[in-house]
Design a protein with these regions (language model features):
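Structured loop/turn residues at beta-strand edges in well-structured enzyme cores
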Residues: 16-19, 78, 97-99
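Small/polar loops that bind or transfer phosphate-bearing groups
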Residues: 2-3, 26, 56-57, 103, ...
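Conserved beta-strand hairpin/beta-sheet module of binuclear metal-dependent hydrolase folds
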Residues: 1-20, 50, 115-117, 124, ...
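Residues that form or flank phosphate/diphosphate-binding pockets in enzymes
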Residues: 2, 32-35, 64, 110
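Active-site metal-binding motif and surrounding structural segment of the metallo-beta-lactamase
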Residues: 5-56, 84-86
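Metal-dependent phosphodiesterase/nuclease catalytic metal-binding core
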Residues: 86-174
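Alpha-helix N-cap/helix-start and coil->helix boundary motif
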Residues: 8, 18, 31, 61-62, ...
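Active-site neighborhood of divalent metal-dependent phosphoester bond hydrolases
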Residues: 49-86
Length: 174
């Protein structure tokens, strides 16, 4: 999240590999949040990155990046997909298997969004031995793990009798 001037150093100090980054999220166009982005992307290219990367950020981010690359005659070895969000509405920016990222408009001197990472609800933990002993088929086990009551062989099975509830889904706001 965000890419100020020290982003490469911060990634190295925290033993994060540049090439493993799948996405970059920019909150607003102030220098301390964006000036490290061209250098980070250029370093990835110099290191031979081939995999595309997605960048979510405010309007004009893509034009700024293209202008910067043009000024220094930079050529990326990989595709850069810029997705610009609106500073006026909550938007789902990215959805993955285990989390969702949303933009949340906030007041600032320039268009700005906070970023909220929301963990999806976790499945219930099934007592596997109990389910096996009862001969529960796969589809019944899956329903119980989703927290859904289900009928099986004339019985109404309730998830709380077969599973332990998951911890509450977490969220992080930046």
């Amino acid at each position: 999240i965000d890419a100020g001037e020290g982003v490469q150093l911060a990634l190295r100090n925290n033993k994060r590999r540049f090439q493993k980054l799948k996405g970059i999220f920019i909150s607003h166009m102030h220098g301390d949040h964006v000036l490290g982005l061209p250098g980070l992307l250029s370093t990835m290219s110099l290191l031979g990155r081939q995999e595309a990367i997605d960048i979510w950020g405010p309007q004009k981010l893509e034009a700024w990046l293209r202008h910067t690359w043009g000024s220094i005659q930079a050529h990326m070895s990989f595709e850069v997909n810029v997705h610009e969000w609106s500073p006026h509405e909550v938007q789902t920016l990215h959805e993955a298997d285990h989390y969702r990222l949303r933009s949340i408009p906030i007041k600032h001197r320039i268009p700005c969004c906070g970023l909220r990472v929301e963990e999806h609800s976790l499945p219930w933990k099934l007592n596997g031995q109990k389910a096996q002993d009862a001969g529960l088929p796969f589809h019944v086990r899956q329903a119980l793990k989703r927290g859904e009551p289900i009928g099986f062989e004339g019985r109404d099975l309730k998830p709380e009798l077969w599973c332990t509830q998951p911890r509450k889904a977490r969220s992080y706001v930046y």
